[in-house]
Amino acid sequence: MTQLCLNEAVYQCEPGESVLDALTRQGVSVPSSCRSGVCQTCMMQSADANVPSIAQNGLKSTLQAQNYFLACACHPLEDMTISLPDSSDRLLTATVTALRQLNDEIICVGLDCPSLQDYRAGQFINLYRDAEFSRSYSLASVPSDSYLRLHVRRLPDGRMSNWVHDQLKIGDSLQISAPVGSCFYLPGAAQQPLLLIGTGSGLAPLMGILRDALNQQHAGEIHLYHGSRDAAGLYLVDELREMAGHYPNFHYTPCVSDSTATSAHQSGRAVDVALAAHPDLAGWRVYLCGNPDMVKSARKKAYLAKAAMNDIHADAFVRVAAANQ
C-alpha cells in the first residue's frame, strides 16, 4: 500500500488502485471524465520525480517535465505528494454563439473562444458544466471557422448532454480546456487516399478532418462512410452530398445497419460497407471515430486489409458509466 499526500492530508492507495480511484473512494473530489487516460480532465501534479511513465502518456513534453500526470492512469509504486493544478491556468472561457439541432439526438453547439490561439481539426476539448464536472467532445470545426463546433448527442442518463440540449442558451459563458488529441489531418502526402469511417456523433471529428484536408488541397481520393442504426440517426446528409458534388475526389456513403439498401443509403455497418468497397488499404490513411467497439474492430480490420498501423488514426467515444454521467 502506498500513501498519497494531498493538501497536507494523507490517503491510502491500495495495490493496483489508481490515484483517481483511491482519492474518489476516500471522498476526495477530482475532476474526471473518461477515466481511461484520454480526455486529460483528471490531470494532477506530483511534487516528486517518481511519476510512472504510463501516467504521462499523451501529455505534452512541457507538462511531463513538470511532473504532471493523469490520475486515472497512475498506479503508484511508492508514496507521492500530489496537487491539483489551478484551473485558471488550464481552462478557457467560451461563449455559446449557435445552437442547431442536427437530428433528434444530436445538437451542434457553436462556441466563441477568443483566447484559443490554435488547434487541429479533429481534436477534442473538455466542456465544463462546473469546476468538477466535464465531458469530452470532438471538434467539427476547422481553425479558419469563426467559432468552434461540437456535436453533442443526447444520452438517456447523460447529465452533461441533457443539460446541453435542455438548458444551454445562446450567450451563455462556460469553460473549456485547450484542444488535445492526435486524430487529425497532417499535410505532406497530398496524393494518399483517405478512408474516414464514423458512427453517430463520430461524424464530428471526421467533418473537421475532411474539411481541413480539402482546405489544404488534398488531391488523393477521400471516402467517408457514416453509419447509424436507422436513417433518423444520420445527419448533415445534404451538406455532405453537396460537398461530394463540389469536390471530385470526395465520396460520401451513408450507411444504415437496420435497413435494406435504398437510393439514399447503403445497408450494413459502416465499417463493413467501407471495407467491402476497399478491401486493400495498403498505402491508405484511415480515420476511425465513434463507438469504441466499432473503432476497436475497424482498427483490426483495417490492419488486416494492409493499412500500416501508423496510418490508422482513431477517436473512440468512451461512454462514462451511468453512475458518473
Model-derived segments and spans:
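Ferredoxin-reductase
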Residues: L91-S173, S177, Q192, S228-D230, ...
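A short, basic/flexible loop-to-alpha-helix module at the beginning of a structural domain
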Residues: P179-G188
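Structural motif
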Residues: P193-L195, H223, R285
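Histidine-anchored nucleotide/phosphate-binding helix
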Residues: P205-N215
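Anionic-ligand-binding alpha/beta catalytic cores of soluble enzymes and soluble regulatory domains
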Residues: L84-D86, D212-A213
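Reductase modules of NAD(P)H-dependent flavoproteins
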Residues: M1-M80, Y225-Q325
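Short, surface-exposed secondary-structure boundary micro-motifs
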Residues: A47-N50, P85-S87, D130, P179-V180
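Short, conserved phosphate/pyrophosphate- and ester-handling motifs at nucleotide-, phospho-/glycolipid
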Residues: G122, G202, N291
